[in-house]
Amino acid sequence: MRLLDSVTKEKIKLDKKDISIYLCGPTVYDDAHLGHARSSVCFDLLRRVLLAQGNRVKFARNYTDIDDKILKKMTQSGQTLEEITEFYIKSYEEDMRALNVLDPDFKPRATHYITAMLDLIKKLAKDGFVYTLEDGIYFDTSKDEKYLSLSNRNLEENISRLSNEVQKRNESDFVLWKFDENFYENEFGKGRPGWHTECVAMIDSIFENTLDIHAGGIDLLFPHHENEAAQCRCGCKRKLANIWLHNGFVKIDGEKMSKSLNNSFFIKDALKEFMGEALRFYLLSSHYRSHFNYSLSDLENAKKRLDKFYRLKKRLDLGEISDFDVLNDIEIKSEIAKQILEILNDDLNVSKALALLDDFISSANLELDKESKNKILKQNIKEALSELAKIFGFGFMDTTLYFQWGVSKEEREEIEKLILERTEAKKNKDFNTADAIREQLNSKKITLLDTPNGTIWEKINA
């Protein structure tokens, strides 16, 4: 696999068997938006590709569960820190399951690594990288000769993103420990960690060595990832990661989607209108490094492309596909899956991979038209679809449930009742009533398909 490193702007070959990946996760003070979803889905695809080709992957995605935004939420809501963070961690994980994002091997929470953070600050203090102000302990960026080597920018370009509310030695200096009487007792003074320190301590505790891949949104490159790299370089005496990957923004009306800009489109809102697999397909439909503007029509088109996958699956009577063995050894046998893996090995070229998937579905349907009773052909296509589902992370649902998605329990009961009435009318040769029921259901965007095994129904989405 070759991946474009955000730092060197060059494709770096990843030819190890064992791969370590750390993905910066959410700050858990509110529901997750599509920007969070895109980061998780893009790097879940990376993980799936590595697993599918036999790599052993150690994957961590953290939770920032102590932060100024969470404290503000505490003040507004009257809830405790634990009540807020537990609620939104559960909410986030529900969203990830809906998007078929594999559960990480490690899900560290910042509050569980306070001792590790303090140990890191001690190392930095011992070597003269810190100083103390009235509100906390700061990292002196002027002492790090390689500071800004990650983002490769002049500091002047980034000043607008930095806070200088206190008299720091340098505008780029950042807080390691914030004094706060309400939190952790230690030799530096009661307080809580700075955001940039949290990730370094968690990475050091879990992985101990230089990461193969550090991933996150492009907005984290500076200052967050720059400051992480500085602490690891100066405190742990090693490079934090060999490859840095950053996904592009999700935009709404040309603006970056952000909770702070109050233009977030929450995952839960999207899931009310579209199933998780359709949303996943949409979020994967452009290259992970590119920005894309949220568009309802593009999301609808992604759903139509996914429909074609399920139409072929339904034609083969292929039921629910298990996602379980993707985390174990899965053997890729089909030629199409091997071709798609080869494409995705080039910096996750997902647009090209999905185009090849579209071509495969069209070709498979043509072959089935010619040889509808060829059992070997059907079995080969079934195996290919199963392998492709595990690589892309969609296509697992039972086809009947897929095409009935979005119908409430009450609506389902009414539909089934009308189908029984129609079946009885047909038995009694009352075709006018049978046709009237079909038209009644069609007006409610329900289409009927009469088969040798009875009548089945689907929801019409267009």
Curated annotation (Swiss-Prot):
ATP binds at K259. Binds 1 zinc ion per subunit. It is an enzyme of class 6 (ligase). Its main location: cytoplasm. A motif ('KMSKS' region) lies at residues 256-260. InterPro entries: Cys-tRNA-ligase, Cys-tRNA-synt_Ia_DALR, Cys-tRNA/MSH_ligase, Rossmann-like_a/b/a_fold, tRNA-synt_1_cat_dom, tRNAsynth_Ia_anticodon-bd. A motif ('HIGH' region) lies at residues 26-36. GO terms for molecular function: ATP binding; cysteine-tRNA ligase activity; zinc ion binding. Keywords: Aminoacyl-tRNA synthetase, ATP-binding, Cytoplasm, Ligase, Metal-binding, Nucleotide-binding, Protein biosynthesis, Zinc. GO terms for cellular component: cytosol. It catalyses: tRNA(Cys) + L-cysteine + ATP = L-cysteinyl-tRNA(Cys) + AMP + diphosphate. The keyword Protein biosynthesis applies. It holds the Pfam family tRNA-synt_1e. Its cofactor is Zn(2+). Its EC number is 6.1.1.16. It comes from the Bacteria. Belongs to the class-I aminoacyl-tRNA synthetase family. This is Cysteine--tRNA ligase. The lineage of its organism: Bacteria, Pseudomonadati, Campylobacterota, Epsilonproteobacteria, Campylobacterales. The gene is cysS.
